[in-house]
């Protein structure tokens, strides 16, 4: 027999190295074979539900870190809620219509114009479904648990039918209408765009000041005066029909070297500087309010028509001249104010952004090229007062990255103005994690214009509208519901395969079509109407889900996207928000906070992390960032995350190794009989558990990440597990002291594995499979630890002890530096009271102080001679008495021999004698 054979060293087959890239797919295969997703639901059937509704990612392209951040956060929530006993189904979804898929096929060489529309749409559908299969596999590889065998997909007939019915309800309530209005138009996509499809980039544009001669001053302005306007879109001047001034602002007629100009008085200095006027040359001749200027007539600078001076409240003094160039065909404010004055809506561009015949001399020119032609013309006729170039933030198409324009075209609209207040009220009834989230969506709804829902494309859900022979619109609810039923049965391709009369209910007649002829709308719906209908197409149609959802969680760009379109359609049809709680996350940047781009070489993708480090490293990283803002990732950050993972894994492994011979049924010590140090740790565990559960409830994963590290490092590694080695390895196997510690260690191991399960989904499952005597086949089928209020008095007492222990460790470190001792077991510590703390009285109730301090001997005295003064007592460290026990390495003055083993202390003699 040798000394080592007498020790109870940790034993476990749980590997030290994670090997996650290889291990995780095995665990996921096991989950699939167990049908874990449905088992979890079955366990919680009949319980209170918690519904997180998945915002559908677009079915095109590989996953980026934003996808991973989003889906992993959702998985934290659903796994946690499920372990809290909630019935929490998670149905992932995909958004499948729209321009990017059309473009992807065009890039592959598909010629859309050379085939029937329905054939092209079938190719789009095939492409979308292929993309979904790729993304689905990648989401599952991240450990996301959901109903991936039956996701919701916006191109499915049942979804499209639900969307059409929702449209029908909005139409029935007078919320859908057709109008010629200026909308964001993308010449590069040849389609209208919603606000959510716009992003801003810098653009270089001409900045011009133009003079409009007064034609009829109405007795207010001199007939030889000129109004000055400023614009950065010279190409819109052929559509100018008015000049707008603010009714309440003051304007002046200024004489500058014999020329008379009308300018806003607050802006005259800026205009003078721009146009190079000397101050002494400027003379104010007349003053008037904008209201007094109403109906003055000016001459268009190069077209034979009047530009009327009108009033509008949108005019500001932020820039320009206070007199605004007004073209109702090319601006929303212009259009609205133009309606009041019955101004014509001129928009002489085609879908490609090229001037039509209506554009006169500019016919055939691309709008951007027309800028030069217009300025040249103004220069020739003397109307151009100044031309320079500026760089400014300008709207671009989010898909093509090309500039967009405002263009008046016949479009379909969903009325925001009619439901705006109802939506704002619904926002007030919604809960938010952060106040700025509420402010953001509130302001967006408050300030947004009417929603243009039509698109001039083919890959999307058709607008279920018909026209009679005389042009009347047919938008009856019954007709729309009939179309919905056709879509549900045959899919939306039926719209393109059949004639209008075959899509209408049998025997349908209309006074506007005496010959029984009808035509159908050719536009499709905005993709935001698709995804914005998911509360109807998913929450209300799937039996396991319910409306409204408990939570919507997406990137912060969705305040103007999915959050916005969803609450609009839900309030319009159901009178309430589709979500009770709204949560958003930021974007993923590189390690320096820069946007990731291939050109910078700073792109990290989920697939790379999973293959190199494992999904649990990606998941742990998600828990380590403040996701409410933009977050950072880099190889260095992931290396730090992997280091934290290793520490967690090794701590769990150590605990596994030390409970291998423990059966809670037969070996557990009742709480009342536990050693006080073990009771302290049990109560620290309770305190820790309560805090972690609270953080999960509040979606505060960064706090969990930090507190787990703190508990592992401070409570376990630096104290309890270190202290425990002298008990777990050395004491008799069945001794009360050892079983007392194992009871608590087992509890810590089980509870910590559960608490980590939503985040480290694979590792927790692996640990669970090695914990002896657990009942559930998966940690994800277990319940979260119950929150038990800790014993505050006990915690307070031991918190003081831990501070005293810190002082002892400082004294030991000093003794080590002074070569008094080497290892701490070579020490004898003498502690006494001082003025700041009565250590002698405080320590009288503590047992096994030498083990708690990891030294060989401790003496507590009223006063210590020659001790170093610390806050928690005077402490002296000397070399321990006696010699080292060869088994436990503690020093003793009573070494002896048992069973052929020499140099054993009395404790070890007793243990070895019984072997």
UniProtKB/Swiss-Prot annotation:
Chain location of the short sequence motif 'KMSKS' region per the record: 595-599
Q: Where in the cell is it found?
A: Cytoplasm
Q: Where does L-isoleucyl-5'-AMP bind?
A: 554
Q: Which Pfam families match?
A: Anticodon_1, tRNA-synt_1, zf-FPG_IleRS
Give the EC number(s) listed in the UniProt record.
Answer: 6.1.1.5
Family, according to the entry, reads as follows: Belongs to the class-I aminoacyl-tRNA synthetase family. IleS type 1 subfamily.
Subunit organization: Monomer.
This protein is called Isoleucine--tRNA ligase
Q: Which organism is it from?
A: Staphylococcus carnosus (strain TM300)
Top-level taxonomy = Bacteria, Bacillati, Bacillota, Bacilli, Bacillales
Q: Which gene encodes it?
A: ileS
